[in-house]
Amino acid sequence: MQYTRTVEALKQGTVIDHIPAGEGVKILRLFKLTETGERVTVGLNLVSRHMGSKDLIKVENVALTEEQANELALFAPKATVNVIDNFEVVKKHKLTLPDAVEGIFSCPNSNCISHNEPVKSVFYVKTLAHDTKMKCKYCEKVFSRDIVAEVR
């Protein structure tokens, strides 16, 4: 069987691979990856031997930090985030859930002061029995990850 690349190689930037199918567009939107001004290559529902199907994102000339990569773990805990330089992987981020996430999500509680005050949203992240919960720093209400992500 002949092996062919579905997506072109990246000279410099970041590759986010092994994203669960259907989560790629959400990650693009939440992390504003299309607002970098750089070329973004997106593969949706690509064939994967390990996952069945997956999404893939490549962002040229942008190197995600460890903190940014860990924030991705909220949506794709088994994703791989590789920083590329001159077509070579120079850094592999090992994803772990962050303790807190700042400025990415809006609080689902319409009475939360974060909607009316000039403050960045902050959520504390906890995993309980395979369910990720997020607690707002300001109103102290606890929400599931899916509810918080939908509000943004």
UniProtKB/Swiss-Prot annotation:
SUPFAM superfamilies: Aspartate carbamoyltransferase, Regulatory-chain, C-terminal domain (SSF57825), Aspartate carbamoyltransferase, Regulatory-chain, N-terminal domain (SSF54893)
Keywords in alphabetical order: Metal-binding, Pyrimidine biosynthesis, Zinc
Cofactor(s) annotated in UniProt: Zn(2+)
UniProt keyword annotation of Metal-binding present: yes
Record-linked InterPro entries: Asp_carbamoyltransf_reg_N, Asp_carbamoylTrfase_reg, Asp_carbamoyltrfase_reg_C, Asp_carbatrfase_reg_C_sf, Asp_carbatrfase_reg_N_sf
Gene3D superfamilies tied to this protein: Aspartate carbamoyltransferase regulatory subunit, C-terminal domain (2.30.30.20), Aspartate carbamoyltransferase regulatory subunit, N-terminal domain (3.30.70.140)
Signal peptide range: none
CC cofactor note: Binds 1 zinc ion per subunit.
GO BP, one annotated term: pyrimidine nucleotide biosynthetic process
Pfam families assigned: PyrI, PyrI_C
Function as written in the Swiss-Prot or TrEMBL entry: Involved in allosteric regulation of aspartate carbamoyltransferase.
HAMAP family linked: Asp_carb_tr_reg
Name under which the protein is recorded: Aspartate carbamoyltransferase regulatory chain
